[in-house]
Amino acid sequence: MKINIFGIIVFVFISIIIFKIYHESDMFQLKCIVSDVDGNKYCVRERNKLELVADLLANVTNNMKDLVEHLKITFPDRKNVQRLVDNFNPKKVYETLPTSSYTAYSENKGEKLAFCTTTTKEGNRLIDENTLTFVAIHELSHLATKTV
């Protein structure tokens, strides 16, 4: 009988740890959907405007792709442009979680680019594309530098 009770306690403990890890992960509150703009998958917060947010991220991603391509053609010998081209991955663009203290960030030089798409933390009003593109250009600059 002691083994059964011990086994149940271990099972419950492990289950709680697994749930806590999943709950605190980036993917807990994100739903990945395909944008109609470019056909790529974007992971966005679960809410009513899933398609609008995915399309906004797709438009900004297209703007980033155009900029990176333009820089690649215009300044092919510059090391910072080469780093930007190497580090930029348009398939790794996400929306930030509501728990994030950042409006935008890049992880590990391009493994992930995350953007807040609303005007306020709790708001439902989407930020305009030009403002988000401005923020995205700032994040791209982090990919082009050697340090943070």
PLM regions: where:
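A conserved beta-strand element that flanks and buttresses the S-adenosyl-L-methionine
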Residues: 136
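Walker B catalytic acidic pair
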Residues: 139
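Active-site-proximal or metal-binding-adjacent scaffold patches in catalytic folds
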Residues: 1-133, 143-148
